[in-house]
């Protein structure tokens, strides 16, 4: 059975691009366009991994990451933050809140696929 990926970003072009990329890599993909929708999606059908933008309406990525990590039922969910905020302080904040990885935009599509595969392999 294919791993489930949730793509969360408020930019439709990025969502479409990542959705296509993840499906081509063999993953099941769902999408959300804001933080509230992301948490609703995680609640409805817990993914194996979340590709999570930081700057979004209705809860930012940091808040979503924190909410996922606060719920023991979602402990196994892997989180990769994808963001234009590339300063070290933002990266440290994301990792401190429980993100497993942090990739800055613009990103290499192959790098995203490889990091997703690596995290899922580590998770077992």
Predicted segments with their positions:
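Two-component/phosphorelay signaling modules centered on CheY-like receiver
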Residues: 12-30, 119
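Acidic, metal-coordinating helix/loop segments flanking the phosphotransfer/catalytic sites
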Residues: 31-49
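Receiver (REC) domain active-site loop signature in two-component systems and cognate sites
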Residues: 56
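C-terminal output helix
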Residues: 107-117
């Amino acid at each position: 059975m294919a791993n489930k990926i949730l793509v969360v970003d408020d930019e439709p072009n990025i969502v479409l691009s990542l959705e296509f990329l993840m499906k081509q890599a063999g993953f099941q993909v769902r999408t959300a366009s804001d933080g509230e929708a992301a948490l609703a999606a995680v609640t409805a059908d817990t993914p194996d991994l979340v590709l999570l933008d930081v700057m979004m309406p209705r809860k930012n990525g940091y808040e979503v990451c924190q909410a996922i990590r606060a719920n023991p039922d979602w402990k196994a969910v892997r989180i990769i933050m994808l963001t234009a905020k590339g300063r070290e302080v933002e990266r440290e904040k994301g990792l401190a809140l429980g993100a497993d990885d942090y990739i800055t935009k613009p990103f290499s599509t192959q790098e995203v696929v490889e990091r997703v595969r690596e995290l899922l392999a580590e998770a077992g």
